[in-house]
Amino acid sequence: MCIRDRLNPLWKACVFLIIAVTIISLPRKPIDVAIPNITVELPSWINGNKAIHVSLLSQEKAYFTQYGGAAAKAIYGDRGLLVVKTSAPLRHLHSPEECLRGLGFNVQYKGVSHATLPTAIYKATAPDGATYRVAVSFASSKGHSTSNVSEAVWNWMQQGGIWYALQRISPWNLEDTENNNWDNAIMAAMDISSSSPFIQPAKF
């Protein structure tokens, strides 16, 4: 056996060792981290009600600090609005079931409404028995809107862009017309069009 034949396995072993060391040494940073320094500013008024801003929980603040993106919450009268803004929807966008159940709510999926934006509807029952309508839509800076997280992620993988989760909370017993009026008021305040739901970045 010639020297070259003897060295070949050794060279291969060295190459694999170098590759392994390189992989181990790479920074442990997730690839789906959103663009940093994203901010969300909710409208000061919606439908005649002034915003009462609600602070994010400490774990929510830590999450957005680590993985980018941003969120803001406010109460308008007897209704609430949560907006999440991200360039990495795979990381940040999800149905409200996960968070609400973690807070002790019983959550039931009730279907999809297209009266305004494509919207997934949930019924959330608080530990004290109070019931709420939780409506969630996802819209992008590219003009897409959907009620489905998977569709939002698929569109993001095709075209990128900034994605927003719009979560509206209202008492469960309101009429559909009242809920639709609330949605339309939010859309007007945030420059969202139902035919081309583009959220103007200047508003955030």
Residue ranges of each PLM-predicted region?
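Hydrophobic alpha-helical transmembrane segments in integral membrane proteins
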Residues: 21-43
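Low-complexity, compositionally biased segments
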Residues: 35, 40, 95-101, 176-179, ...
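Extracellular/secretory pathway and lumenal proteins
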Residues: 5-6, 103
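Short, small-residue-biased leader/transition segments that mark boundaries at the very start
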Residues: 1-3
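Internal/C-terminal transmembrane anchor helices
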Residues: 6-29
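Short, solvent-exposed recognition patches
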Residues: 44-158
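A short, solvent-exposed beta-edge/loop patch
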Residues: 19-21, 111-204
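Generic detector of short, well-ordered, non-transmembrane alpha-helical segments enriched
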Residues: 42-45, 163
